[in-house]
Amino acid sequence: MVYCPYNKEHKMLRKKLQQHILKCRVIYKDTVELMVCPFNSSHLIPEPQFFQHTQSCEDRNIIVHYQTSAPAVLSEDTRHAKIESEENWDDDESVPDYDPQVYCSRANIVREPNGLFPAQRRAFIEQEKRRHFGEDYEEEKKPRKAKARADLRPTPYEHRRPYSRRQ
């Protein structure tokens, strides 16, 4: 259990400290002036004790150890000699660039007409059918639906005469 740096009566688990500090900082922003430790942001110290804390902070050892340790030395086993290549693919200009649209139009791939207007979509689908089934593909005409008998009968509202006032 740890205590809140703003109010010693607040006691909580260490994992809840950061969340609690954010709340207390808003509440006590005008009354208590605390400085944040450069090694651990959960350490909030009054200004007179700040210098002493930075000298004796337990999280300072991580930084000091990093600063005083010798840099890593690569052994000869891990160094690789530079390999020179005889060919450079960037210099070869005889090969055309890859174009995915051209590839898809030639390969046996089903493409989707995304982002097209309805008329363009119908033309695209028709073109794709011709591409997949060959040039001898004939467009199948969809038969129109015949009107049902119920559609041919007049509704009761069609035979009514316009409303006239009684006299």
From Swiss-Prot:
Pfam families: zf-U11-48K. One of its GO terms (biological process) is regulatory ncRNA-mediated gene silencing. Zn(2+) 2 binds at C37, H43, H53, C57. GO terms for molecular function: tRNA binding; zinc ion binding. Interacts with piwi. Belongs to the UPF0224 (FAM112) family. This is Gametocyte-specific factor 1 homolog. It comes from Drosophila melanogaster.
